[in-house]
Amino acid sequence: MRILISNDDGATAPGLAALYAALEDYAECVVVAPDQDKSGASSSLTLDRPLHPKVLANGFISVNGTPTDCVHLAINSLLDHEPDLVVSGINLGANLGDDVLYSGTVAAALEGRFLGRTAFAFSFASRQLDNLPTAAYFARKLVEAHATLDLPPRTVLNVNIPNLPLDHIRGIQLTRLGHRARAAAPLKVVDPRGKEGYWIAAAGDAEDGGEGTDFHAVMQGYVSITPLQFDRTFSDAFSGLDGWLEGLR
């Protein structure tokens, strides 16, 4: 088995190293990841300059681009054989609810959809490293079990692991995406030369975080697995739009 591993925290991120270490004796793993932190890059592609892959001392390949660039380039140019699986992470910080719209971790997994196979996006609900081995354990466990999955093509499994020791994890739950409240306003700052700028503020708190959501599962000590699809068509809106268009013809 061949696994393509990527992330959005960058090629030197501890979560990426932990994921590789968890999988390297299970499959032939190739790591292609951004050369710097690209959190929040979503599914953006770099179109204004060429991409330059660089092989690092540990064998990982870094690219001066986004997570989507990395997977796109790896599948279409860098690899001699297509991978059997695309795995992204381990992100330091959860990707819950609306986070998936912005997450480079999820985007890297989504780019693997062209293979027509299931892909995984793994996120750990902390930026502290003490319990990162818990996330690595579940990444290995779920990847090992993926061969028995019977899912529609191009399914992405968004996995969030609580910041807990392994023996404190209560189990695994299948969840839906929750929703966040509106984020705080960007923070206005002034640099030493008097030039004004803005920092994007933290994401909003969970607004829809009840039972059954990814928010609730992680808060209750469960690993959350949410199946995602690329098709964002809002089918329920068709009937209302049909009537609206009739009046415009």
UniProtKB/Swiss-Prot annotation:
InterPro entries: SurE, SurE-like_Pase/nucleotidase, SurE-like_sf. A divalent metal cation binds at residues 8-9, 39, 91. It comes from the Bacteria. It catalyses: a ribonucleoside 5'-phosphate + H2O = a ribonucleoside + phosphate. Belongs to the SurE nucleotidase family. Gene3D superfamilies: Survival protein SurE-like phosphatase/nucleotidase. One of its GO terms (cellular component) is cytoplasm. Nucleotidase that shows phosphatase activity on nucleoside 5'-monophosphates. GO terms for molecular function: 3'-nucleotidase activity; 5'-nucleotidase activity; exopolyphosphatase activity; metal ion binding; nucleotide binding. Its EC number is 3.1.3.5. Binds 1 divalent metal cation per subunit. Keywords: Cytoplasm, Hydrolase, Metal-binding, Nucleotide-binding. The keyword Transmembrane does not apply. The gene is surE. It is an enzyme of class 3 (hydrolase). Pfam families: SurE. It is found in: Cytoplasm. Its main location: cytoplasm. This is 5'-nucleotidase SurE. Its cofactor is a divalent metal cation. HAMAP family: SurE.
